[in-house]
Amino acid sequence: MRTNFENLRVYQLSEEIADAIWETARGWDAFARNTVGAQVVRSADSIGANIAEGAGRGACADNRRFVRNARGSLNETKHWLRRAYRRRLLTEQTVAKLKPLLDELGPKLNNYLKSIGRAAGAASDNGQQTTNN
């Protein structure tokens, strides 16, 4: 059964992270925005895009592959945030806002990945808390 990806908490969390990173990078100077900023925004946006694309695929194997891609994009996002922090582009306040979200998303992606294909044919939210947004 296909999942309405927009209702998955894992997807909503990825959007929250991507939006927070976008707002942060917008305030950087042109050089930082066009180098590290472009990379971190792209990788953060890719997390949710992969969740959405995987949910739209007909086969569980395809969905799992895209969720693995989302995990890779999460790790890439963490890399670029580390670069931004070391280059003094991130404030402690921004780090304090992003870190708990990033720490929450990794396990949620893993749990979502494990749940894909289980209870085939049964109505399922793939192990995620869902909302009706």
Where are these regions (language model features)?
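Amphipathic alpha-helical assembly/interaction segments
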Residues: 1-133
